[in-house]
Amino acid sequence: STSGDTDADHTAPVISAALAGCTILLPVDRRSGELTAALQRHGAAVQLAPALTIIPHIDDDELIARSRALIANPPDIVVVTTGVGFRGWVETIDEAGLLEPFLAALRPAQIVARGPKARGAIQQAGLAADWVAESETAAELQEFLLAEGVAGKRIAVQHHGSGSDGLDEAFEAVGAEVVSLTVYRWGPSPDPAVLRRSVRAAAEGEFDAILFTSAPGAEKWLGSAEALQVLPGILEQEAAGRLLMAAVGPITAGPLVDAGFTPLIPDRGRLGSLVRSVVTHFGGGHAHGVQTVAGRLELRSGGAVLAGRFIPLSRTGLDILSVLMHAGGGAMSREALLSAL
């Protein structure tokens, strides 16, 4: 389910109409099929535009096994080389239900970060970095720890992407015990044209919600929006109540918050909780709308919901209805309506 514009699998049985008329964008690679089916069961149209491809380096089972070993025998030092890699590690541990013992094992350790992004990810996880390499180089980090002395110390080294930078070997050479953890590697978007189209469409109001399942994916998608100079337009859609940004957990939400969004974050960091939160938002009267004599009116990308009933509308019909809604019952000239089209 990494391909193009749409619509993973239409065979999912519909169990509610809470998302009828909603077009939801998934800029995700991991478990997108599962998420698509869950949203379609509530009547949503789903589009896929993966911002990244995950290239497994060591699988989640291996990462979790090594993390369990750290919980059982906590490290003296934790080396965090990248913000995205550390976030990915925390997300994997959270999904495995091990977050609390994992953080408890890391908290007493000396935590060192290779630059401000790594420090930010450490802080978002509720931990504190004891030292940060201002040059953002592994060489500075290595020099600092070797000068402090690491003989006999148990060191957890989080790697990401391009490998170890020689850290494991340098620490082992002076008598440290190294637990090496490579989270996963990110490859480029499988279809950059679809990714570019998705950020432009978001700025033009074509989506009701965008769901993020990883911090690296969120960073990459927002980076694409920034590069195409459409990020302000996407922020405007959210501010107007026409776009819901949602993230599976606070780590994933980090890049969205940094960019100025106010994402919906479920209480539990699970895909099922994310889907339920989105269904509750649109199906429970929490989406932007107005009260009318005929009941509550809410706009969707595919039409309007009036008193809980979905009414399909053309784009022109939606544009006119949107202008009238914003007028709040005030009179509108024909010219003003035409200018909105």
Question: Residue spans of the language-model regions?
Answer:
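Conserved beta-alpha
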Residues: 1-306, 315
